[in-house]
């Protein structure tokens, strides 16, 4: 009986006599399209079933957070005093801890060593109405059941009787309706319901749970105003500025408001504003989900909409003709669009979590603020790089030139030189000018003439801030001018709390900006445009270029076309992705440095340090990186250790992983192949060791594989190093 060797999905690889079988097997495990015997229908079914597994993992993970906080955390103590108790994520059980470590990590009122939570879950659960450990346990158990249900659903949809057919997967209108109405619309409506029935009453000291849920009116007039059209009643009598969150003191009765600004005590958005926001989104999306033609012969057809989109001027050729089938038949195109959207949204989450904090007391937990910002920006970067990667794979595997003749997609390819060269020009302009300004300022400081620095006020950005109501700059226009119509309307009609919030120095709305911000803004613009240049060029040149017209025949990732064809190395679409990730990490480094340093000054009440030191490179290196590393690297020293020691160690460990990346990035395949052959020679001639044999002949990783291993270590090390720096430097200052 012959045992089937890994990988089962590729007979060719399973029969490979070398260790390539293992590494290529792992590398192509998720490339379902290219597996043996894969049909289009089976491909869709496999991916569909895997979505249930994904949801199960997410629910299980969230369930674990709830469970560990309920079991080992201090949620009930934190609720009593959110600003003075440090939230505990979970206990640490480590038999290696000496007494100093046990004492250093015993905090937050715990009886033994614990980890402090910097994820914001305490603030989130508190805001949505949870108050006891029992609430957390119930949530945890519910999510465990939900995860189980999703796992079962995933299994079920792989059974022949319950596998949807290909036509079901390609029914674009039904899917649009379902996702718009069902997922976005109804879930937003359900969330509005939770906020109105549970969270808002809890914020006013009224405890609503399943036992009194149906007997407690969320508004004194019940549904009467809704049915009589007197909707304004729901906005009357909002919570006052003196409201104590979680109590009835200073509370009102409004459930759907348009107050704007922040709750003065919690520094977070008004719950009644958020309920109103989700209700509006629910209405919009439920309506949107009834717009597409399915069973009843009414509504829009996506195909008809796209076929009709031809610019009357003729300047866009065939417009959107042919795009319906191109998108609907390409999973890579769809994934590219989805990743581009989600990546952008993820970056917006990073921006809004600190500028418009939705959770009570989040704004006063500085380490959590910094962590959430950094976390969401890095994730956005990876997701957006993935969008272009799948865009490139679409061009190689799925694009049909005949079906897209003269449409906007074909026209993008036809004028790709103009697109790529413009991005190149912008990147060069930004790079030389920004670096030139920074370096000039360094030289002036170094030569003892700091007054000769070139310091440019960002007047256009300040003008935009002023038009939204920021008065600090003295630009009298629109909302920053008390005699303007916009200002008058803003007082009564919409968001009366906005102008107070935007001119309050205790939050992060429309921060005051100067020459340092102007420079770092352009440094970040350089990073964004260079990353985009590499990604866009990779996708637009994926099918071929003047240098290599037959590139698409070589697939998504290839190292070179042999020794006989010079210049074909490093030009696969995969290589563009690989290079772009380095630029992405570089850019997000600048973004997070900027956010963190500027906020450290605001939180410490010392904004002048950023303003004075951020205009030259040595200022960034000395007053941000070096100065904020000092406490971190003293987590352990000759005199002992403290609670930052774990971050000190992780800082070193991150550097180690990062440096390991270069080992794979700098020394290439031939070096490893020679080394491996030497090691095999030695192994076979060493007593005892020579008893151990293997079937696969050891060979080095391919060039592309070595690059991906190098990239993975570079990325992981880079992020772990900064995570340790960020958490240690922030928590050391603010506890």
From Swiss-Prot:
Task: Provide a GO CC annotation, any one.
Answer: chloroplast thylakoid membrane
What is the disulfide pattern of this chain? none
Q: What is its EC number?
A: 1.97.1.12
What is the gene name?
A: psaB
**Protein name per Swiss-Prot or TrEMBL:** Photosystem I P700 chlorophyll a apoprotein A2
Query: Could you tell me which PANTHER family the record lists for this protein?
Result: OUTER MEMBRANE PROTEIN, OMPA-RELATED (PTHR30128), PHOTOSYSTEM I P700 CHLOROPHYLL A APOPROTEIN A1-RELATED (PTHR30128:SF19)
Tell where it localizes.
Plastid, Chloroplast thylakoid membrane
What the record notes about the co-factor is:
P700 is a chlorophyll a/chlorophyll a' dimer, A0 is one or more chlorophyll a, A1 is one or both phylloquinones and FX is a shared 4Fe-4S iron-sulfur center.
